[in-house]
Amino acid sequence: MKLSFSLPSKSKPKVTATTADGNNAVDDGTSKEFVTEFDPSKTLANSIPKYVIPPIENTWRPHKKMKNLDLPLQSGNAGSGLEFEPEVPLPGTEKPDNISYGLNLRQKVKDDSIGGDAVEERKVSMGEQLMLQSLRRDLMSLADDPTLEDFESVPVDGFGAALMAGYGWKPGKGIGKNAKEDVEIKEYKKWTAKEGLGFDPDRSKVVDVKAKVKESVKLDKKGVGINGGDVFFVGKEVRIIAGRDVGLKGKIVEKPGSDFFVIKISGSEEEVKVGVNEVADLGSKEEEKCLKKLKDLQLNDREKDKKTSGRGRGAERGSRSEVRASEKQDRGQTRERKVKPSWLRSHIKVRIVSKDWKGGRLYLKKGKVVDVVGPTTCDITMDETQELVQGVDQELLETALPRRGGPVLVLSGKHKGVYGNLVEKDLDKETGVVRDLDNHKMLDVRLDQVAEYMGDMDDIEY
């Protein structure tokens, strides 16, 4: 069986390029534009063509769109009514005489001229004909393969716009059935530096701008008086309301810049450098707030001292650790003198408890012992300012404790020199539990006997 069919050639949709004037133009890469005149009152027309790809017609199941047409009524014998016609037997269809009426069983007549293979071939040919018809319909609706000319006629960057323009879309017009305006594409920018999850760059910019404006307004208010003059001038008495020297009073001796002052502390020859926002006039509201805050802190400290039997841990350590040693003099008389054992060690954290030392600016400040220069004297590096303070006596200090689980060193008592972790601490009873890292034993100690250790185990001197 031979099968052959032919497909008619279809015309490809041509891509039209329209210029700004509406005229078609072909962008073949070698287009020329001739200038005939120069008119300064007119702007140059956009010579870049706008490509438009015509839409492809929807040919899916075209038979569904077809409608059955009503046949016109025949008017030949419309008025004559029904008529009977005698049946004329066709040749070869005469009824035999021996036919019997009633239920009869038909017998198959074997026709030698028509075989079974011919019937089967006839059935197969009908199925093949249906498939061929379906194949022809698919091939008729199949688009042609694109050629190189199709790719060269429209640039890649303008293909989407040209395709949408064929359906009536214009730049700035929304896409969709009920679109009112064009939706801008959301751009995702890569986060950098410390920008993590939940970071909002727009909000951070607003906060930074507000902070800068607030700081500038604050500086302007600090540096300018009511009459336009300078509020803080050299020789004026001021109060320090912020920073490490909070609460001290002094005189401005120098203004190295617009943001800093050099103040000489009253009652001493010490000079400190503070910011513009860290000083206030004597008798101002800022000074009153600062003094009230310091007073509240002192009251809280007094209540804490009363709760611990009226003595701090540093004073209690000194009173409990005092031993009396008797010595005989040449006259044969004996006298008692107090000998205070040293508990200072390097790499431990301490707190300054003296209000009079250094004008009180280091009161309740924490630091690290960097060197023990004498039995009861050491050098300390302050935590906040990294300032090195030399020649500090242990009477001005008390030990600082870490949080639960922090490293500690036992400084005195029967467990002196033990390095471990602080498991529990009771501030009311001034007791704690330390776990020794060597044998993992639990040791009961007083809190004034231990301090936070900030060094290595190799630095411990047993």
From Swiss-Prot:
Keywords: Nucleus, Plant defense, Repeat. GO terms for biological process: defense response to bacterium; innate immune response-activating signaling pathway; mRNA splicing, via spliceosome. Residues 1-10 have a biased composition (Low complexity). Residues 301-336 have a biased composition (Basic and acidic residues). It comes from the Eukaryota. It is found in: Nucleus. Residues 231-258, 401-428 form the KOW domain. Residues 156-202 form the G-patch domain. GO terms for molecular function: RNA binding. GO terms for cellular component: nucleus. InterPro entries: G_patch_dom, GPKOW_KOW2, KOW, Spp2-like, Spp2/MOS2_G-patch. The keyword Lyase does not apply. Belongs to the MOS2 family. Required for innate and induced resistance to pathogens such as compatible and incompatible isolates of P.syringae and P.parasitica. This is Protein MOS2.
